[in-house]
């Protein structure tokens, strides 16, 4: 339809001038309307209300003005086409000019930079080669001087001709050794103070080696000649016609003489260094020539001092040819082009990159040639340009561009090498066309190509614009898309609102009954008539109820996790107890599935950490639950160890005994680790590593990464077999990442899955961490009789690590055999004879135990070792009872162990009972009880105590599930909820009073049983009363609300009863009403009777209209209550309206009754709403008892509240 309207509008355009003007006016009007429509859409797209108005406007324009808008769209598209074409032409033209300009300029600059680098490299290489030659020559000269000084000092002041000859022969030998080892040397000379000369020379023309020396007969033994320059110089050496010079050919390898010495004239001598070359007694360099070579020679001279280091006794000269430098220059020029040459400071050529001569023949023999006289034209012209430009004061470094030599332009660069008395200048001459020739040639071609390409791009662009904009107008498509987007956004916002409202309603509907259940359990726990077993059962029910409440909170946090707005709490908690309580909870399910649950925490784990305990427990609960789901046999191990954050290195690896955690995600984790080390530099942070290892079906390695995604499972059939939504591991990963860690599936040996993760938590500064007791000094011997091999192995390993002798037994027969060998009289002296089937390791362990003096035996027996299917277990108990006076028994009970078995154990005096599984904390408790028993010296058992009442053993069962409520169940529930009371009932094993009571009961004899149980000191009785009460308050605070009058408005009968009992126990006077209307009415009648709501109540509108005046007048006179606890959701009149009515009645008076909100809503917006209507505080259900007391005291008795805080 839209396309038809568009075509009809085009076909019906009038051709007359009037029609043309009308058409233009219509187009202008429509175009203006479109502009007004598009502008607010772009600026106010984020406002939902304006989007609704815009949507209505769009729909109206769509259906009423379709043809007008289509016509306007056609012409607007035509105008846009022309504008785009013009703009494209301008942009392409500018792009062409700018491209040509910047390409030319930047290319030229880049090439010049490269040219400079090339020239610099060409200069540096001869410099390096020259330095190599100089260093080699200098090192050889120094070595020869040191050798000469050593020999001369050895023959200091020879007195006879024989000693002098012997010294010269030694000098010859050491000089030959050095000369033969340095193949690059041309000659080595030694000129002695008495005029004697020794020299070695290589003739490159004939490849011969010669030894040159003067006649020794013409020189005295001691050099009496002058030591200054005037009496001892090079000229005297070469011009001494009276001296007889000899030259003897040598073997180039062995140095042996080849033939007899031959006399030579002085003119044939090589360069011999004299004292004139070392006038100041230091090394010097000079250039010389030889008739044997066509290139200059570089000679170094050093003096040789006598033993006193005061006078010169000889001069050593080392001569090296500069041929290698010239060869390097020629190699460089062949690759890069141009010319390179070296000159002395006076301008004499030393080496060039050409094959031209470097010496010129004169009547006095070969002489050095100046660069300005070179036969090579480029070198000659360059040297003349440098001399003309800079004269005799040439700078050390010269960089010249575009130097015209003849018809070409060159780059000329020079460097300066300063030697002792021999400065050297290097020059590089490169033709400019070698670098910039191609650029200059192609500059014009490049411009033509760019212009042609720009024109082609312009025409192609215009064609593409015409093709792409042809057809239905783009604005029409955008309008339809806009309408769809606005509608989709409206539906998404409505869906989000529905979701939020649903979560809020579910929070109220579920938290209200859960609050009632938990409150009733608290009342039941506070009953002193509960036995220990009943108390444990009720406590476990409360934990499960709190776990359900935590699941509800997880539902509320789901949206926060998805949006990344989840806020973790930062509070101290006992990490070990959290994990122990978690393992205890899951162990019941694992025992039913014949799966062993093991907790293996290292000793260096911190006792207290700071973080969100509820989230941490949620992580491991999901992981362990997932392992239980897929594990049908074997074990599930939760391991934990720690390391300091400053010990993290590049791979974040841990030592081998820490099970080698992987380096998480390589580069990403290295960056993450660097960030953590910087941000936590001054914080007391710890890296806690954990592993959840199971023996289940395992996960395909290809699925190791995908299992952490939302709604992903390793196998599609998992949902049908085991259930689940695939969200558990996703939430775990999000929580782990939120805590600064990572989680990953790693490879393991054997069946099952190994999940490894690390968390970064802080530890308190003032708390002593990991104070481990020393058990090695008490002579303890522990026998572990457990069916589970994994837990038995880990426990025995920990015991042996702490110096406790440990013996393991897996069944009844092995246990009885070990007991007989260790505890029966005479068995320990038989050295475990071979008739018993005992393994060698066990035999060695038993032998070590025999050597322990005064051992204390502790036998930990799994109840499953006994045959409970028949009555044989009683006989087994009777058998073990024979050894009760020699060992202490601790029993591992299952959750379903019958009361008959427990009663029989108590009757036999076995009072140390621990619920499975057994882990380090429980083992420590058992050992501490035994050690305390030994310290007191009480060695009698409790065999006959079974005749007494069962209540005498209620406190003797060692079980954290009975005493420890400081677990995750009482941890913080949500980020918007206050901290729940964690001190309902402290752990008995951490109480010194109960520890004393435990040892007293376990070590009392039969005669003192009744006395010890009846004569309890007041401190113990008071502690036990507080232990078994659901309100863990001090005696002085049990009536902390004494005298406070509280009005309770609650519509749920159970919650009303719970709150009333709770407040009355703390001394408050409570008046309960059923809705907000009765709460407002009760302010007129203090003694109102709370009745259950009936159908006879009038509607809210009728009573409000009739009684509002009376209520407001009465509130102005008096205040019958000190505080009001107001439920927010009630019938007839809710808490919000009731609060508004009360606050309106208080206007004009000095009264202000504190109102505390009670609500099951857990959203942060609910608290703001309560405070906005006039309430003074906000409490969520279930009610935190301590928080409620502190809130009431702060509003009614500020002074008492401050006193309690300071206390």
From Swiss-Prot:
<dbReference type="GO" id="GO:0009927">
    <property type="term" value="F:histidine phosphotransfer kinase activity"/>
</dbReference>
<feature type="modified residue" description="Phosphohistidine; by autocatalysis">
    <location>
        <position position="508"/>
    </location>
</feature>
<dbReference type="InterPro" id="IPR036890">
    <property type="entry name" value="HATPase_C_sf"/>
</dbReference>
<keyword id="KW-0902">Two-component regulatory system</keyword>
<feature type="transmembrane region" description="Helical">
    <location>
        <begin position="82"/>
        <end position="102"/>
    </location>
</feature>
<dbReference type="GO" id="GO:0009414">
    <property type="term" value="P:response to water deprivation"/>
</dbReference>
<feature type="topological domain" description="Cytoplasmic">
    <location>
        <begin position="1"/>
        <end position="81"/>
    </location>
</feature>
<feature type="region of interest" description="Disordered">
    <location>
        <begin position="964"/>
        <end position="987"/>
    </location>
</feature>
<feature type="compositionally biased region" description="Polar residues">
    <location>
        <begin position="1"/>
        <end position="10"/>
    </location>
</feature>
<feature type="topological domain" description="Cytoplasmic">
    <location>
        <begin position="468"/>
        <end position="1207"/>
    </location>
</feature>
<dbReference type="Pfam" id="PF02518">
    <property type="entry name" value="HATPase_c"/>
</dbReference>
<keyword id="KW-0418">Kinase</keyword>
<comment type="function">
    <text>Functions as an osmosensor histidine kinase that detects water stress and transmits the stress signal to a downstream MAPK cascade. This protein undergoes an ATP-dependent autophosphorylation at a conserved histidine residue in the kinase core, and a phosphoryl group is then transferred to a conserved aspartate residue in the receiver domain. Positive regulator of drought and salt stress responses, and abscisic acid (ABA) signaling. Confers drought tolerance, probably by regulating levels of ABA accumulation. Plays a redundant role in regulating plant growth and development.</text>
</comment>
<feature type="compositionally biased region" description="Low complexity">
    <location>
        <begin position="1000"/>
        <end position="1014"/>
    </location>
</feature>
<dbReference type="GO" id="GO:0009738">
    <property type="term" value="P:abscisic acid-activated signaling pathway"/>
</dbReference>
<dbReference type="InterPro" id="IPR050736">
    <property type="entry name" value="Sensor_HK_Regulatory"/>
</dbReference>
<dbReference type="InterPro" id="IPR003661">
    <property type="entry name" value="HisK_dim/P_dom"/>
</dbReference>
<comment type="subunit">
    <text>Interacts with AHP2, depending of the phosphorylation state of Asp-1075 in the receiver domain, but probably not with AHP1 and AHP3.</text>
</comment>
<dbReference type="GO" id="GO:0005034">
    <property type="term" value="F:osmosensor activity"/>
</dbReference>
<feature type="modified residue" description="4-aspartylphosphate">
    <location>
        <position position="1127"/>
    </location>
</feature>
<dbReference type="GO" id="GO:0000155">
    <property type="term" value="F:phosphorelay sensor kinase activity"/>
</dbReference>
<dbReference type="Pfam" id="PF00512">
    <property type="entry name" value="HisKA"/>
</dbReference>
<dbReference type="InterPro" id="IPR005467">
    <property type="entry name" value="His_kinase_dom"/>
</dbReference>
<dbReference type="GO" id="GO:0005886">
    <property type="term" value="C:plasma membrane"/>
</dbReference>
<dbReference type="InterPro" id="IPR004358">
    <property type="entry name" value="Sig_transdc_His_kin-like_C"/>
</dbReference>
<dbReference type="GO" id="GO:0006970">
    <property type="term" value="P:response to osmotic stress"/>
</dbReference>
<keyword id="KW-0812">Transmembrane</keyword>
<keyword id="KW-1003">Cell membrane</keyword>
<feature type="domain" description="Response regulatory">
    <location>
        <begin position="1045"/>
        <end position="1196"/>
    </location>
</feature>
<keyword id="KW-0472">Membrane</keyword>
<keyword id="KW-0808">Transferase</keyword>
<dbReference type="InterPro" id="IPR001789">
    <property type="entry name" value="Sig_transdc_resp-reg_receiver"/>
</dbReference>
<keyword id="KW-0597">Phosphoprotein</keyword>
<protein>
    <recommendedName>
        <fullName>Histidine kinase 1</fullName>
        <ecNumber>2.7.13.3</ecNumber>
    </recommendedName>
</protein>
<feature type="region of interest" description="Disordered">
    <location>
        <begin position="1000"/>
        <end position="1021"/>
    </location>
</feature>
<feature type="transmembrane region" description="Helical">
    <location>
        <begin position="447"/>
        <end position="467"/>
    </location>
</feature>
<keyword id="KW-0938">Abscisic acid signaling pathway</keyword>
<feature type="domain" description="Histidine kinase">
    <location>
        <begin position="505"/>
        <end position="763"/>
    </location>
</feature>
<feature type="compositionally biased region" description="Basic and acidic residues">
    <location>
        <begin position="975"/>
        <end position="984"/>
    </location>
</feature>
<dbReference type="Pfam" id="PF00072">
    <property type="entry name" value="Response_reg"/>
</dbReference>
<dbReference type="InterPro" id="IPR036097">
    <property type="entry name" value="HisK_dim/P_sf"/>
</dbReference>
<dbReference type="GO" id="GO:0010431">
    <property type="term" value="P:seed maturation"/>
</dbReference>
């Amino acid at each position: 339809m839209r396309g038809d309207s568009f075509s009809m509008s085009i076909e019906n355009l009038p051709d007359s001038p009037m029609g043309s003007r009308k058409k233009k006016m219509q187009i202008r009007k429509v175009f203006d309307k479109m502009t007004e429509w598009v502008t607010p859409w772009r600026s106010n797209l984020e406002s939902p209300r304006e989007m609704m108005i815009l949507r209505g406007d769009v729909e109206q324009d769509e259906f009423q003005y379709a043809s007008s808008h289509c016509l306007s769209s056609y012409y607007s598209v035509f105008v846009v086409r022309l504008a785009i074409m013009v703009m494209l032409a301008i942009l392409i033209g500018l792009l062409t000019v700018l491209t040509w300009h910047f390409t030319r300029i930047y290319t030229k600059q880049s090439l010049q930079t490269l040219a400079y680098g090339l020239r610099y490299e060409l200069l540096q290489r001869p410099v390096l080669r020259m330095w190599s030659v100089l260093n080699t020559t200098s090192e050889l000269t120094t070595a020869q001087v040191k050798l000469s000084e050593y020999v001369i000092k050895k023959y200091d002041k020879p007195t006879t001709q024989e000693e002098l000859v012997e010294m010269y022969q030694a000098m010859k030998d050491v000089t030959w050794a050095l000369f033969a080892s340095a193949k690059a040397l041309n000659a080595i000379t030694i000129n002695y103070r008495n005029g004697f000369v020794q020299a070695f020379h290589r003739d490159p023309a004939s490849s011969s080696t010669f030894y040159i020396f003067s006649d020794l007969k013409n020189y005295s033994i001691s050099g009496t000649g002058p030591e200054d320059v005037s009496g001892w110089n090079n000229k005297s050496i070469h011009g001494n016609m009276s001296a007889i010079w000899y030259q003897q050919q040598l073997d180039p390898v062995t140095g042996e003489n080849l033939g007899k010495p031959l006399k030579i004239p002085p003119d044939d001598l090589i360069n011999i260094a004299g004292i004139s070359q070392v006038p100041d007694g230091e090394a010097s360099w000079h250039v010389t020539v030889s008739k044997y070579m066509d290139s200059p020679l570089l000679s170094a001279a050093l003096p040789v001092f006598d033993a006193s280091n005061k006078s010169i006794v000889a001069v050593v000269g080392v001569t090296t040819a500069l041929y290698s430098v010239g060869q390097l220059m020629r190699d460089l020029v062949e690759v890069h082009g141009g010319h390179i040459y070296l000159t002395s400071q006076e301008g004499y050529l030393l080496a060039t990159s050409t094959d031209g001569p470097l010496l010129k023949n004169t009547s006095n023999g070969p002489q050095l040639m100046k660069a300005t006289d070179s036969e090579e034209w480029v070198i000659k012209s360059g040297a003349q340009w440098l001399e003309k430009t800079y004269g005799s004061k040439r700078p050390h470094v010269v960089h010249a561009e575009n130097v015209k030599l003849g018809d070409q332009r060159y780059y000329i660069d020079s460097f300066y090498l300063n030697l002792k008395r021999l400065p050297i200048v290097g020059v590089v001459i490169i033709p400019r066309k070698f670098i910039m020739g191609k650029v200059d040639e192609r500059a014009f071609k490049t411009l033509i190509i760019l212009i042609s390409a720009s024109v082609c791009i312009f025409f192609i662009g215009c064609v593409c614009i015409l093709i792409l904009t042809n057809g239905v107008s783009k604005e029409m498509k955008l309008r339809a898309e806009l309408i769809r987007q606005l509608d989709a956004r409206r539906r998404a916002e409505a869906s989000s609102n529905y979701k939020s409202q649903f979560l809020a309603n579910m929070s109220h509907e579920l938290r209200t009954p859960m609050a009632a259940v938990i409150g009733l359990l608290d009342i039941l726990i506070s009953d002193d008539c509960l036995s220990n077993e009943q108390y444990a059962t009720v406590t476990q029910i409360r934990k499960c109820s709190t776990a359900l409440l935590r699941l509800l909170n997880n539902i509320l946090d789901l949206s926060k996790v998805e949006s990344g707005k989840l806020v973790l709490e930062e509070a101290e908690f006992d990490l070990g107890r959290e994990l122990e309580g978690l393992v205890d909870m899951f162990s019941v399910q694992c025992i039913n599935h014949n799966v062993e649950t093991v907790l293996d925490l290292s000793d260096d784990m911190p006792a207290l950490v700071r973080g969100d305990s509820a989230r941490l427990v949620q992580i491991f609960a999901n992981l362990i639950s997932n392992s239980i789901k897929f594990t049908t046999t074997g074990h599930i191990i939760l391991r934990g160890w720690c390391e300091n954050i400053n010990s993290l290195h590049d791979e974040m690896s841990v030592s081998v005994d820490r099970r080698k955690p992987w380096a998480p995600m390589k580069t990403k984790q290295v960056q993450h680790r660097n960030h953590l080390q910087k941000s936590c530099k001054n914080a007391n942070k710890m890296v806690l590593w954990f592993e959840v290892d199971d023996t289940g079906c395992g996960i395909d390695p290809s699925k190791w990464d995908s299992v952490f995604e939302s709604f992903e499972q390793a196998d599609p059939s998992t949902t049908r077999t085991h259930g689940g939504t695939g969200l558990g591991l996703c939430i775990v990963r999000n929580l782990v990442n939120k805590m600064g860690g990572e989680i990953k599936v790693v490879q393991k040996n054997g069946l099952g899955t190994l999940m490894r993760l690390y968390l970064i938590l802080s530890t308190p500064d003032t708390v002593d961490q990991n104070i481990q007791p020393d058990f090695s000094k008490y002579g303890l011997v522990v026998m572990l009789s457990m069916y589970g091999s994994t837990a038995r192995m880990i426990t025995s390993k920990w015991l042996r690590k702490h110096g406790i002798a440990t013996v393991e037994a897996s069944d009844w027969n092995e246990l009885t055999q070990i007991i007989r060998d260790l505890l029966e009289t005479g068995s320990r002296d038989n050295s475990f004879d071979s008739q018993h089937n005992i393994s060698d390791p066990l035999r060695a362990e038993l032998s070590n135990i025999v050597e322990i003096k005064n051992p204390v035996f502790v036998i930990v027996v799994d109840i499953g070792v006994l045959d409970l299917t028949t009555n044989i277990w009683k006989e087994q108990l009777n058998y073990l009872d024979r050894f009760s006076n020699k060992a202490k028994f601790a029993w591992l009970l299952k959750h379903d162990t019958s009361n008959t078995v427990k009663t029989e154990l108590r009757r036999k005096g076995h009072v140390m009972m621990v619920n499975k599984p057994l882990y380090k904390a429980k083992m420590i408790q058992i050992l501490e009880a035994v050690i305390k028993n030994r310290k007191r010296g009480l060695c009698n058992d409790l065999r006959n105590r079974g005749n007494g009442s069962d209540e005498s053993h209620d406190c003797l069962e060692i079980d954290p599930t009975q005493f420890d409520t400081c677990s995750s169940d009482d941890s913080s529930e949500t980020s918007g909820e206050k901290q729940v009371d964690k001190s309902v009932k402290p752990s008995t094993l951490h109480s010194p009073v109960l520890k004393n009571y435990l040892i007293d009961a376990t070590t009392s004899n039969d005669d003192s049983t009744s006395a010890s149980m009846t004569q309890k000191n007041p401190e113990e009785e008071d502690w036990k009363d507080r232990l078994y009460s659901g309100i863990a308050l001090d005696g002085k605070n049990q009536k902390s609300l004494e005298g406070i009058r509280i009005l309770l408005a609650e519509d749920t009968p159970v919650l009303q009863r719970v709150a009333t009992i709770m407040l009355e126990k703390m001394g408050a006077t409570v008046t309960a009403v059923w809705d907000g209307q009765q709460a407002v009415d009760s302010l007129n009648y203090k003694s109102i009777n709370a009745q259950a709501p009936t159908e006879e109540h009038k509607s809210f509108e009728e009573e409000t209209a009739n009684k509002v005046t009376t209520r407001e007048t009465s509130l102005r006179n008096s205040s019958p209550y000190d505080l009001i606890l107001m439920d927010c959701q009630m019938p007839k009149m809710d808490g919000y309206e009731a609060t508004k009515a009360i606050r309106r009645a208080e206007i004009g008076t000095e009264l202000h009754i504190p109102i505390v909100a009670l609500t099951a809503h857990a959203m942060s917006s609910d608290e703001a709403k309560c405070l906005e209507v006039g309430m003074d505080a906000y409490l969520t259900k279930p009610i935190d008892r301590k928080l409620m007391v502190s809130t009431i005291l702060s509003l009614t008795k500020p002074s008492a509240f401050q006193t309690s805080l300071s206390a």
